Amino acid sequence: MVHIIIGGAVSFIIAILFTPILIRRFSDEGLGQEIREEGPRSHLRKRGTPTMGGIAIIVAIVGGYFLAHLASVFTPSSYKPTASGLLVLGLTVGMGFLGFLDDYIKLAKARNLGLNKKGKLLGQAVLAIGFGVLCLLFLNEHGLKPASTKLSFVRDIDTFDIAIGGGIIGTLIFLLFIYILVTAWSNAVNLTDGLDGLAAGTTAIVMAAYSIMTFWQFRNSCASNASVACYQVRDPLDLSILAACGLGACLGFLWWNAAPAKIFMGDTGSLALGGLVAGLSVTSRTELLMIVIGALFVAETISVVIQVVSFRSTGKRPFRMAPIHHHFENGGWAETTVVVRFWLLTAMFAVAGVSMFYADWLGWT
């Protein structure tokens, strides 16, 4: 438990102290966000606000994670980084770097368009497939890998193996699934990052839920507690530490990103957090449960899909603007009202998800 607290606290401190340094540096260098002309008119006043604040989030997560492990040397239970934790951390940093390239191109060209779609999808594919391949390696002494090829809700669904038939074909199907998952979640968080504090606040809530669930998995791991309700997760404690680091980093950044935002996380932050969300869902065996906990991200994405499909097929737009947070904003809701209400919705989704997780455990005991 102490490792989790240290990781979250250190990440919060790093983020809250490092973010203003980035604000001053980026302001001095004129690295400000360009605002799309077709966006809400009220957002034009945000033009020039420093961006790429996701750098602080990534540094905070990495720093908190490794310092938590370093501090564990001085506690009764020394704990080393694990394959699962390092793989999710690597995916987070890799997605963040991809987002950084996107942000940098936007700033270099002074327009709100960065990497083209093909370039971004290719980068996501390389990172997702690399993550997926490595997740099938690193077998521990209990015969567990960082990921399972079986689809999971709260735990593996034994009758639903994604790698149908096994072998090379089965592995390729599994890697395709991982690619879809990573791409979907990273883009979903990216779409949510459209209002001051929205993505940071909602992701913080999701990270809190995952820190709780993975700690419960650790306390009831089959490696130490071979009960009928135990969890077949390779490194649950390390995942809990990493989720706590994500929580702390988001809260520390939110201090400066809350309305009126002094800095934006940019694609650097949103893609990194999307990678963290996807990685945690895979390594904790909760891919389907993440849809419940991260339902707001799902709603944001679906609103864009509906808007595009409807306009292309009928010429009509069902929403005033997509993603859906802009629909409410253009409908007269104040930006802060939309953000706070979406935080509340995310909290309710998180409670529902954690309740389902715990209800499953009760059903087995």
Swiss-Prot record:
Q: In which pathway does it act?
A: Cell wall biogenesis; peptidoglycan biosynthesis
Instruction: Check the record and name the CDD domains matching this protein.
Output: GT_MraY (cd06852)
Enzymatic class: transferase
Protein name (database record): Phospho-N-acetylmuramoyl-pentapeptide-transferase
Instruction: Give the residue spans that cross the bilayer.
Output: 3-23, 54-74, 81-101, 119-139, 162-182, 198-218, 239-259, 263-283, 289-309, 342-362
Which organism is this protein's natural source? Answer: Corynebacterium kroppenstedtii (strain DSM 44385 / JCM 11950 / CIP 105744 / CCUG 35717)
Enzyme Commission number(s) of this protein: 2.7.8.13
- Biological process according to GO: cell division; cell wall organization; peptidoglycan biosynthetic process; regulation of cell shape
What is this enzyme's catalytic activity, as reactions? UDP-N-acetyl-alpha-D-muramoyl-L-alanyl-gamma-D-glutamyl-meso-2,6-diaminopimeloyl-D-alanyl-D-alanine + di-trans,octa-cis-undecaprenyl phosphate = di-trans,octa-cis-undecaprenyl diphospho-N-acetyl-alpha-D-muramoyl-L-alanyl-D-glutamyl-meso-2,6-diaminopimeloyl-D-alanyl-D-alanine + UMP
Protein location: Cell membrane
